[in-house]
Regions:
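Short active-site oxyanion
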Residues: 36-40, 59-61, 149-151, 207-209, ...
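Mg2+-dependent phosphoryl-transfer enzymes with acidic/Ser/Thr/Gly-rich catalytic loops
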Residues: 1-4, 22, 184-256
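Asp-based phosphoryl-transfer active-site loop
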Residues: 3-18, 222
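Residue-level signal for inorganic ion chemistry
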Residues: 32, 67, 151, 195, ...
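Hydrophobic packing residues within well-ordered alpha-helices of enzyme cores
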Residues: 50-54, 162, 166, 221, ...
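Short hydrophobic/aromatic-enriched beta-strand-loop microsegments
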Residues: 60-66, 84, 128, 176, ...
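Active-site phosphate-binding/coordination module
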Residues: 23-122
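Conserved acidic, metal-coordinating active-site core of Asp-based
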Residues: 101-212, 216-218, 233
Length: 256
């Protein structure tokens, strides 16, 4: 029996230029909750950004945020079920390295605030208005006033051009992953870590979970659950790894 649904956002629940969850999906989330099935977004996004995206049902959801680095239970706001902070000294060293790279901007995440350094006004506008993050500006990484759970490099020249440099220097200390055309994330957690936290808090077994994803950073969570689904437009390698494919998440939710 399925007791938990986890779902990636960008490329899975939202496609192309979509910026809002459609009414059909929100209706299915409500219906499943009435049946005792919890819906849990699993994303690299911040908690505030995810709550804004799911505003009509946000209090009823758990959230795997920042690629598994912090997990919130249902509520307004929900309790922190778990988080995986970075070593502060290493995180600040990483931030300083990012600052030396041409065209790279630091975006370091706390529990529900991100901290930008060496950025311009357009970057701030994008993070606050388009992404929906609570974003503060700091003059120096040392000024970040809380535990750092994720460091991101915004690479104006593209993540693919910078990933080799950062992997060579930092893969021994962090999980280093491309998180978008211009983003590279550094964490100690992944979405599978987040799922473990949710399952422990709920008393749910992985085989009682159905998960949806579309990219390589979804592999840890898809590999753990009883019913993994990959989007039909995902990379061929991923479609071969996970035989259950779907075009739209709502189509599968209706069958539960």
């Amino acid at each position: 029996m399925i007791r938990l649904v986890t779902c990636d956002i960008d490329g899975t629940l939202l496609h192309g230029t979509e910026t809002a969850i459609d009414a059909e999906t929100l209706g299915e989330i409500r219906r499943l909750r009435e049946k005792g099935v919890l819906f849990c977004p699993a994303s690299g996004r911040q908690y505030h950004s995810l709550r804004r995206l799911f505003r009509p049902v946000a209090d009823e959801l758990a959230f795997i945020c920042e690629n598994g680095s912090v997990v919130f239970g249902p509520g307004s706001p929900g309790p922190v079920w778990g988080k995986v902070p970075l070593d502060r000294t290493e995180a600040i060293r990483l931030c300083r390295d990012i600052m030396t790279q041409p065209g790279c901007v630091i975006n370091a995440s706390g529990e529900n605030t991100c901290y930008a350094c060496n950025c311009d006004e357009e970057f701030l506008r994008h993070m606050r208005e388009d992404v929906g993050n609570i974003t503060e500006v700091v003059d120096d990484p040392e000024d970040i006033p809380e535990e750092i759970i994720k460091v991101s490099a915004f690479c104006r020249g593209g993540a693919d051009a910078a990933i080799g440099y950062f992997k060579e220097r930092w893969e021994a200390a962090f999980q280093v992953a491309v998180a978008g055309e211009q983003w590279i994330d550094f964490t100690l957690a992944d979405k599978g870590t987040g799922l473990e936290i949710v399952c422990r808090a709920m008393g749910v077994r992985p085989e009682e979970v159905i998960s949806f994803g579309d990219n390589y950073n979804d592999i840890p969570i898809l590999s753990m659950v009883g019913r993994p689904y990959i989007m039909e437009n995902a990379a061929e390698e991923l479609r071969e790894m996970f035989p259950n494919h779907c075009r739209r998440v709502a189509e599968v939710l209706k069958t539960l």
